[in-house]
């Protein structure tokens, strides 16, 4: 079917808007992609995939790669920045810097929250899902930069966004589930209850959605590759929402 002039104009306008949005996103990230599809994959949640597309077309494989690239680059940064620190001290600093909450903070500072591509999950679930996968998306973007521009480009991104954090005073690492439980006890509330809401994905690569409940409070949900990981995300979401201090461990 031949497109009418009006349809052609709308198509060009839509393409131009998409190009402008990509350019703005690249500017915030600080890397111009030779292959923009890598960036799009890095910000695409599995729920946004059309029928017939593989889970590998979402951010998850890039997240795996980016996680290891981040660990390598930050390890190198720590090795040179703290020449008198022993292996144990370096490991603790590394764990704090690469935890999901740290990655999510970087993603927030870059304004990536609204760039995540999700399927139709409803406004309430949309907001929860965006927050729960923000750290994963940051790692996926690192993976995309690595594939597109190599180690040097990925290292530049990490150094630009992690150097200042590396020199901040360390905070004690605490499990968000422990923080939430202690806060609940201080409020005279019972122990938080975690329940599995949904399990999706194949047996070898499951995704768990878990909710945490406390009387008088709206449930908070988290998503992770294991029940425990999802529980920690859910606890972190409730901690952030209720303004609880002390949840620092990813």
Curated annotation (Swiss-Prot):
Cofactor(s) it depends on: Mg(2+)
Organism (species): Bradyrhizobium diazoefficiens (strain JCM 10833 / BCRC 13528 / IAM 13628 / NBRC 14792 / USDA 110)
Entry's family note: Belongs to the ribonuclease III family.
Residue positions binding Mg(2+): 63, 136, 139
Protein's name in the database: Ribonuclease 3
Record's catalysed reaction(s): Endonucleolytic cleavage to 5'-phosphomonoester
Key word NAD present: no
Domain RNase III: 22-150
Domain of life of the native organism: Bacteria
Primary location recorded for the protein, binned into one broad class: cytoplasm
GO cellular component assignments: cytosol
């Amino acid at each position: 079917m031949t497109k009418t002039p009006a349809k052609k104009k709308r198509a060009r306008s839509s393409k131009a808007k998409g190009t402008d949005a990509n350019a703005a996103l690249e500017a915030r990230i600080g890397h111009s992609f030779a292959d923009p599809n890598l960036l799009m994959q890095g910000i695409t949640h599995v729920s946004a995939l059309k029928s017939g597309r593989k889970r590998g077309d979402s951010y998850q494989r890039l997240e795996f790669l980016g996680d290891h690239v981040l660990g390598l680059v930050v390890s190198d940064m720590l090795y040179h920045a703290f020449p008198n620190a022993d292996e144990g001290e370096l490991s603790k600093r590394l764990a704090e810097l690469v935890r999901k909450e740290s990655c999510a903070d970087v993603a927030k500072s870059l304004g990536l929250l609204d760039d995540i591509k999700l399927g139709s999950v409803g406004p309430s679930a949309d907001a929860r899902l965006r927050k729960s996968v923000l750290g994963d998306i940051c790692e996926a973007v690192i993976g995309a930069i690595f594939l597109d521009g190599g180690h040097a480009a990925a290292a530049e991104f990490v150094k630009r966004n992690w150097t200042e954090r590396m020199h901040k005073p360390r905070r004690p690492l605490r499990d968000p589930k422990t923080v939430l439980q202690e806060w609940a006890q201080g409020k005279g509330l019972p122990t938080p209850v975690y329940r599995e809401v949904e399990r999706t994905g194949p047996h070898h690569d499951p995704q768990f959605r878990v909710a945490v409940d406390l009387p008088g409070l709206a449930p908070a949900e988290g998503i992770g590759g294991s029940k425990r990981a999802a529980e920690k995300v859910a606890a972190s979401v409730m901690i952030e929402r209720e303004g609880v201090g002390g949840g620092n461990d990813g």
